[in-house]
Amino acid sequence: METINTTERLAALRDLMKKNKVDIYIVPSEDSHSSEYIAACDARREFISGFSGSAGCAVVTLDKAALATDDNWLLLKQGLQDVPTWQEWAAEQSESGKVVGVDSTIISAPDARKLLEKVKKRGGSDLVAVEENLVDLVWGDNRPSRPKEPVKVLARGFSGKDVKTKLEDLRKELQKKKSSGFIVSMLDEIAWLFNLRGSDIPYNPVFFSYASVTPSSATLYVDSSKLSEECITHLNDNGVSIREYSKIFSDVEVLSQSLDSEDAKLKKFLVSSRASWALKRALGGDAKVDEVRSPIGDAKSIKNETELEGMRACHIRDGAALIEYFAWLEHQLVVEKVEMDEVIAADKLEQLRSKQKHFVGLSFDTISSTGANAAVIHYKPEPGNCSIIDPKAVYLCDSGAQYFDGTTDTTRTLHFGEPTEMEKKAYTLVLKGNIALDVAVFPKGTSGFALDALARQFLWEEGLDYRHGTGHGVGSYLNVHEGPIGIGTRIQYSEVPLAPGNVISNEPGYYEDGSFGIRIENIIMVKEVETKHQFGDKPYLGFEHVTMVPYCRKLIDETLLTRREKHWLNEYHADIYSKTKDFFKGDELTMSWLEREIEPL
């Protein structure tokens, strides 16, 4: 791994801070669209800090610099007891009237508001929007260019719903909220709304854009050079105007002026609660804007039947690729005695996936991790800086792919030698939690917050736990992490009940630092189920699993499983066999591995 000396960069940034009369400068991880994954041109926090982790925020003063990140990284444990958040640390530094600055296009309006409150409380002077991004100025000509990848139309056979219908549904929501319009800033929401896909951000089939939808108009803001004639015709046919990406802020200022009349004052514009501070300011601030949970995000999270069928189909193909990979990997390590590192193994898995129908690319960096590396939740092996896979240790593989008909995310933990009793016990407790969530039946209106304990209960009985959520929403040929639903202890997961059509992960785990890690992840879909009674006349819901990859037989301690759990496991494995066996005709190695792993308990 390349070592980055950030001393000169920080010195240059501090010079610019002085010129702009800023004492403290905030460098978030996000781009202008609050994206989880970002393009290289937006990796400002990594550039200034040298830290390439998946989440965090850099705070730079004239004589100090701090980096806060989530507790999936052990080097800095924001979110743990007695460790301040970046907002708290920045506010502490702002005492005695100091000024805090930030690029207002890359911080959300709620985050900016919370930061200002903390700064004022600690005696700071103000939070100011610095017009030019100071890190970009330090980066200069070496900053990567903004991607200009082509945008493509997603066929109706994959989307399941046309753009006109989606716009009609959105306008009904605007009418309910008595709103003048919705300014859309989340890239996956724009891609979904207009049935378009791109590749501007690694692993996410999205493209840089904004959108504006009013009762009488719809406008897509995008670099028009990225649009083919097919895209232009597609948008025009659906009543969507095209404007250049750079015009969004000037255009929303004009839209804001339309609210100056007495008749319009009660009809605010809506923005997502993750929209940037800059966007909200351009629209006129609180007087003219309401921050809401995005109605597009809500609609997108409930898949239509075409999308659900696509998820079923792509998970069968993806499962076949994973089964072939695990059989191949075991043979290479155990029989051929090949020394293989984590990256080479991950590359082989990508190669096998790429042969599957409708394959587009990966949905995130493959976590191919052996031994102690498996205990690092967001571990990312790098060429030249990864481990040789140890056949005598636990191997955890968390991976996924993008297909035209869906998005996959599967984790399996395997052992190619003789696991310890603790490894088997931990694996089986995690498996029991995975099964408990899969078979859960619950009344309509139940949130993922309420279900989280089902997956943890068997670990809790032993005084064990894991420091991550149990489930995240999954897009349909879109982002692998999709809101607003989730299963976990975060209070936000109590705000949105699960609904039929939701697609979500089921991924309990257990990790022993420096030793091993266990995680089992299936993708499950919410559906209505029949129950003998319906208390309160409420429908009851359950799950349908679509992941088709067997569990590791060697790691299962059968004595810890109930008869019901064994029956469920045998039925699941039989289902996998029936749906994937035709992929392995003539492939004795893979078929032999599969038959061994699914042998009934």
UniProtKB/Swiss-Prot annotation:
Recorded superkingdom: Eukaryota
Alphabetical UniProt keywords: Aminopeptidase, Hydrolase, Manganese, Metal-binding, Metalloprotease, Protease
Protein name: Probable Xaa-Pro aminopeptidase P
GO cellular component: cytoplasm
EC numbers for this chain: 3.4.11.9
Homology family: Belongs to the peptidase M24B family.
Record bears the keyword Protease: yes
Top EC class for this record: hydrolase
Catalytic reactions of this protein: Release of any N-terminal amino acid, including proline, that is linked to proline, even from a dipeptide or tripeptide
Binding positions for Mn(2+) 1 per the UniProt entry: D409, E507, E521
Gene Ontology MF term list: metal ion binding; metalloaminopeptidase activity
PROSITE patterns associated with the record: PROLINE_PEPTIDASE
InterPro entries, sorted: Creatin/AminoP/Spt16_N, Creatinase/aminopeptidase-like, Creatinase_N, Pept_M24, Pept_M24B, Peptidase_M24_C, Peptidase_M24B_aminopep-P_CS, X-Pro_aminopeptidase_P
Alphabetized CDD domains for the sequence: APP
Cofactor: Mn(2+)
Chain residues that bind Mn(2+) 2: D398, D409, E521
Any one GO BP annotation for this protein: proteolysis
Summary of the function given for this chain in its UniProt record: Catalyzes the removal of a penultimate prolyl residue from the N-termini of peptides.
Co-factor binding comment: Binds 2 manganese ions per subunit.
